[in-house]
């Protein structure tokens, strides 16, 4: 579980504070949210791939979204009651989660590729990764000048081996928060949601190992 505390910015004029408080979004507003943050030097460096290591070929297919509201991934609320929904920018949390998983695996040296559908067994990948989204949300609560951000994820990840048709399944849940953010930007929400989402991927990788062309639990 991630627990972070950050303070951004400094003292601001009272007039600016009043503008921030009065500029509350209405309940009908929607902000698009990327599960893999776009832009920024820090983000660009984090998605750098490494040379693939020898091992099985892995395909990641879109996750099943088991949430009641599949478009929504949280909200921003103000101290005056205004609310803005965060929606998945592409419209599919399952696809973006799978693509984020592929990015993570490539950074770890896996021979991983995203596939829109499950590949055919013949001449296909050695391992197919899929999953289910049980929880995926980031909520930003604005107080007087400062905003607290909390992200929560719960994923089921399944790996199916082509060689013997065996499979393994793991479920993980993680949360994290950034408190007292002075000037909230949607990228702040994207960043922490991405961090928490990757904790699920990290746990899966840490608790599995390759055995020839298959994947097993450690």
Per-region residue spans from a language model:
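A structural "domain/chain start" motif
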Residues: 24-98, 206-218
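Short acidic, glycine/proline-rich loop/turn micro-motifs
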Residues: 72-74, 140-144, 181-186
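Amphipathic alpha-helical segments
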Residues: 96-109
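Bacterial N-terminal signal peptides
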Residues: 12-21
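N-terminal secretory signal peptides that target proteins for export/translocation
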Residues: 1-7
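Surface-exposed short loop/turn segments
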Residues: 25-39, 108, 115-167
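Short secondary-structure boundary motifs at beta->alpha junctions and helix caps
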Residues: 80-92, 160-214
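Generic short beta-strand segments
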Residues: 62-67, 132-138, 175
